Curated annotation (Swiss-Prot):
The lineage of its organism: Bacteria, Bacillati, Cyanobacteriota, Cyanophyceae, Synechococcales. The gene is dapF. It catalyses: (2S,6S)-2,6-diaminopimelate = meso-2,6-diaminopimelate. This is Diaminopimelate epimerase. The record marks H169, E218 as: Could be important to modulate the pK values of the two catalytic cysteine residues. It comes from Prochlorococcus marinus (strain NATL1A). HAMAP family: DAP_epimerase (MF_00197).
Length: 284
């Protein structure tokens, strides 16, 4: 059976989007997700992407429901770049029109979004989670109210922090982000037992109080060019530790996100682009 799809990217973090509001794709993906999704996301034998987004009807009075799969078939709670790609898709298909706020249902809860006249997409990412029990992580809360601890990796002792934006994130500060053994550290830390559900891993280099560089190892995907929830988690931790202001530019391999956590309370806001790559038709 042929199905239409569109491929979108947010700072190089790319997704295959299927509108599943009027077909049985949700059931099909749920039943065959592992090999099926890995094949579609394979960059040599499939369409190629970091993940797949299904657009579904919402039962909670939201505009739509977003269901997202990582390239390994796992289902994350939320994805900041993915939700921007979803909004760009809806906007390109003239579904949003004059709406000032677009509520989206996700596995992590209700996410409020908006899009401006320049097609920059702003997302209310909700309040960060810093409780070790709720992230979840075995790291303990430090005096600055951030989960913190050390992890030994061969001859390295890494000082690590944790936060959640509906999904778990480990933050590791480094002096030279290009000088670390990224593949080795990322793959090891993703599966570390300090995080019972595995974790996204972010290596952070502080440029100044308003700018940071982040390199992403995404849970279920490996290296990606950007991670929206990760950028937010990094800003939460850097601002709590006094390393940045409450708003900063987060420079990822795929580009820049603007992240703000006003007064270090309430929701975190993220703003950045999302663009269509191409559309097509595939037998499923």
């Amino acid at each position: 059976m042929k199905n239409n799809f569109s491929k979108y990217q947010g700072l190089g973090n790319d997704f295959i989007i299927f509108d599943a509001r009027s077909n049985n794709l949700d059931h099909l993906f749920s039943k065959n997700k592992d090999n099926f999704i890995e094949h579609l996301c394979n960059r040599n034998f499939g369409i190629g992407a970091d993940g797949i987004i299904l657009i579904l009807e919402s039962n909670n009075k939201c505009f739509v429901r977003m269901k997202i799969y990582n390239s390994d078939g796992s289902e994350p709670e939320m994805c900041g770049n993915g939700i921007r790609c979803l909004i760009a898709f809806l906007n390109d298909n003239n579904e949003i029109n004059e709406l000032s706020e677009i509520p989206i249902e996700t596995k992590a809860g209700l996410i409020l979004t908006s899009i401006d006249c320049n097609e920059n997409i702003k997302v209310n990412m909700g309040e960060p989670i810093l409780s070790p029990l709720d992230i979840p992580t075995k790291l303990l809360m430090n005096s600055l109210k951030v989960p913190n601890g050390v992890i030994t990796l061969k001859d390295q002792i890494l000082n690590v922090y944790a936060a959640s934006m509906g999904n778990p994130h480990m933050i590791v500060f480094v002096n030279d982000i290009e000088g670390i053994p990224f593949q080795e550290w990322g793959s090891f830390l993703e599966k570390h037992n300090t995080f019972p559900n595995d974790t996204n891993v972010h290596f952070v280099e502080i440029i100044d109080k308003s700018n940071i560089k982040v390199k992403v190892w995404e849970r279920g995907c490996g290296p990606t060019l950007a991670c929206g929830t990760g950028a937010c988690a990094c800003l939460v931790v850097t601002s709590k530790l006094g390393k940045t202001l409450n708003n900063a530019n987060v420079y990822l391999p795929g580009g820049k996100l603007e992240v703000e956590w006003p007064n270090q309370s309430g929701p975190v806001f993220m703003q950045g682009p999302a663009l269509k790559v191409f559309s097509g038709e595939i037998d499923i």
